Amino acid sequence: SRFECERISKALQIPADRITAIYNGYSTHFTPLPEVNMHIVQQYIPEKGFLFFLGNTDPKKNTERVLKAYSLYLQRSATKRPLLIADLKEEYIDRVLQQEGIADIKRHLYYPGYIPNSHLATLYNASFAFLYPSLRESFGIPLLEAMACGTPVVTGNTSAMPEVAGSGALTVDPSKPEEIADRLLQLEQNPTLYQEQKAYGLQRAQQFSWARTAGELSKVYQSIKI
């Protein structure tokens, strides 16, 4: 990302014009599915239409604020969609819930632990929205995966995330749980906005591919004078 190029330039004192940003792509199986395989979905959560979050214990993933935001969402939502959390253990989630004083939301959470990559496209398609409000990302391939599936995305307005997402995602200040909750409620309460974000995400994802990555990398190699 250009964000990382700037960081490298400053940290290593390399002229910016000597660094080229070449964007990642995503696997082509991330695409809108004509029909969601409920057998896969129900391995993790009973019904589709849930909120989806790929978490881990790295502080930059912002798990504490995501759960706080979800608590705020539940207080104001008529639908109260469940939250599916990938790649986090129950002990960690319990600790965060106790720390934030929101243990009462646990009944709305599903946390199956590891979810294989082969199931992610189905889960993106089955979800109502994807949460990716990290504090920092060098790129953010899950953004592309979700957008490519036609899933509305809520992401952070910091580091490389707005650069990657463009208009294909709703951005928030990731340090403010109330903003994350507001965006979820906007998607839920405004059908026009929801459909627009699905379309914008699909359009944005089409600008990225591994073939394009390879082509741009090849151009850089060919431009090097030995």
Where are these regions (language model features)?
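Carbohydrate transferase catalytic cores enriched for Leloir-type hexosyltransferases
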Residues: S1-I226
